C-alpha cells in the first residue's frame, strides 16, 4: 500500500480565483497516488492558518503576509506559494500566472469583438494589481489601442463608483 501524502491548501475560498486554484489542485491530486488534500476554508479578510497540531507533508498556500510566511516556515515542511504578492524575504517556491500573456489574451479577446478603446479597473495600492494593470496597458498600446485606467478607493465602505 502506498503512503498517503497529506497536503494542506491555504487559499481564500471566498473568491473565484481561490476556488479555481483549489479546483486545479484537486484535479491534479486525483491523478496522483495517495494524495489527501485538506482545504482550509476562509473568507477574503480572514487569516489563513494551519490548525494546531496538523500533521501533514506539505502546504500549497497564498502567502499574503510575513506572519503567514513565518508560521509556514516554522512548520518545516515543503511549501508552494501561489500568491502573486511579492514579499521581501519569502523564499518558498512560487507558482503564479503569466501576467503578460494573460493581458495579451484579454486584449485579443476585445480586439476580436471590435473594441479599440479599452479600460482597466483595479486597486492601485496592491502591487500585484499594479503589475496586471501595467501589462494590460502595454498589451493595449502594442495593438495601437487606447487604454484608460481607473483605480477605485480601497477604503472600507467606499465603493469609489
Tell where the protein language model's regions lie, with residue ranges.
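Bacterial carbohydrate/catabolite-sensing allosteric modules
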Residues: 1-58, 68-161
